[in-house]
Swiss-Prot record:
Location of the region described as Disordered in the Swiss-Prot/TrEMBL record: 33-72
Gene Ontology biological-process entries: aerobic respiration; mitochondrial ATP synthesis coupled electron transport; mitochondrial electron transport, NADH to ubiquinone; proton motive force-driven mitochondrial ATP synthesis
Name the record gives this protein: NADH dehydrogenase [ubiquinone] flavoprotein 3, mitochondrial
GO molecular function, one term: NADH dehydrogenase (ubiquinone) activity
Family, as annotated: Belongs to the complex I NDUFV3 subunit family.
Superkingdom, taxonomy of origin: Eukaryota
Gene: NDUFV3
Matching InterPro entries: NDUFV3
Reported function: Accessory subunit of the mitochondrial membrane respiratory chain NADH dehydrogenase (Complex I), that is believed not to be involved in catalysis. Complex I functions in the transfer of electrons from NADH to the respiratory chain. The immediate electron acceptor for the enzyme is believed to be ubiquinone. May be the terminally assembled subunit of Complex I.
Length: 108
């Protein structure tokens, strides 16, 4: 319901409406923070104010050394137009002949 109203007002009207609503929410937040009494429990006695030590930070994990000498696929970055030609020639003797439909191909 609010979207058509905002669209009719244009950019300036929508911005003005958003700023007004933001002020309402800011006022609500300050009311909530003032209504809560700090430092007293429900019985009216002050809470134990023990000083807590800051949380201990875990020891930093040592970084693993970068070693690219153990990379197994050494030809990975050497692809070219002839990369698979030798494999294609080796496997060509194992290929089965393809059945023909009886018609000549369009290139003949």
């Amino acid at each position: 319901m609010a979207a058509p109203c905002l669209l009719r007002q244009g950019r300036a009207g929508a911005l003005k409406t958003m700023l007004q609503e933001a002020q309402v929410f800011r006022g609500l937040a300050s009311t909530v923070s003032l209504s809560a009494e700090s430092g007293k429990s429900e019985k009216g006695q002050p809470q134990n104010s023990k000083k807590q030590s800051p949380p201990k930070k875990p020891a930093p994990v040592p970084a693993e050394p970068f070693d690219n000498t153990t990379y197994k696929n050494l030809q990975h970055h050497d692809y070219s137009t002839y990369t698979f030609l030798d494999l294609n020639l080796e496997l060509s003797k194992f290929r089965m002949p393809q059945p023909s439909s009886g018609r000549e191909s369009p290139r003949h």
